Amino acid sequence: MGKLKLLNTIAPAYFYAATVVTFALHFLLFTPTIFQSSDVTINPAMLAHISIFLFLMGNALGNYIMTIRNPSESANETVIPVCSPDCPDRIDAHYLLNGRHFCKVCKKVILKRDHHCFFTGNCIGNRNMRYFIMFSIYTSSSCLYSLVIGVAYLTIEYSISFENPLTFLTLLPLSTGYFFLGLISGLQFFLVIMLYIWLGIGLVSVGFCCQQLLLVARGQTWCELQKGQLSECRGTWRANLTDVFGSHWVLGLFVPVPTVETVPGNWQVYHDHKHD
């Protein structure tokens, strides 16, 4: 449990650091180099790049904040469950009743718990699932966009060719060797590492997004899937998606704002409210 709590502290710090570095690289290196023009200070291509980048990052950070600000904890629980040392449930959660779980990391009872997200430091459940999915979508988009811009910068600044599909398989090991031999600068080596970080985070976020969308459409949570259980509130895929994304889901695709009414405190009341 101590390792999980440590991870709960390290993961958000890693996210904040990666975000700051990404902003710095885009505005201090990538934008001035790739979109520079001798005629005007700011050209249409630069404005388009800045707009796209800020839109993607703004939505990623906005949904990240909304995921944290809308916890799925139960407001009606006054007694904190105590698990025995030989508790058969997973190490990070203990199943109670009616779709409720006690998270051993959060020390809270979570309504319709899906999983504990270490990057946000809280559990994903009925109230913040929409924001978590949109956070995953925009995080993957931001990272993959940064990957493309980073490749363009390395091509322009260091004449690295990415025409060969095998370049990504050899770039990191070769750059590591060249760096320790003193053949490339620390900045170039750092940028190569960032390419792989963006690629890794982007692909993982895409995987999370696809998994969560599938589970939401089936009306199932990750906790239920692991135990081979069907949802206690199973409905049609359209109703399940509406429960999470709301009737104004189109707005939520572009702006990190609430698009579904929730009745905090009790999942059964919330579910009955949504299906009245």
UniProtKB/Swiss-Prot annotation:
Role description: Palmitoyltransferase that could catalyze the addition of palmitate onto various protein substrates and be involved in a variety of cellular processes.
Record-listed E.C. numbers: 2.3.1.225
Transmembrane segments: 10-30, 46-66, 132-152, 166-186, 189-209
Superkingdom, taxonomy of origin: Eukaryota
Protein name (database record): Palmitoyltransferase ZDHHC22
Keywords noted in UniProt: Acyltransferase, Endoplasmic reticulum, Golgi apparatus, Lipoprotein, Membrane, Palmitate, Transferase, Transmembrane, Transmembrane helix
Catalytic machinery residues: C117 (s-palmitoyl cysteine intermediate)
Topology within the bilayer: Multi-pass membrane protein
This protein's encoding gene: zdhhc22
Native species: Danio rerio
The keyword ATP-binding is annotated on this UniProt entry: no
GO molecular function: protein-cysteine S-palmitoyltransferase activity
Cytoplasmic-side positions: 1-9, 67-131, 187-188
Family: Belongs to the DHHC palmitoyltransferase family.
Positions of the DHHC domain: 101-137
Chief localisation class: endoplasmic reticulum
Cellular component, GO annotation: endoplasmic reticulum membrane; Golgi membrane
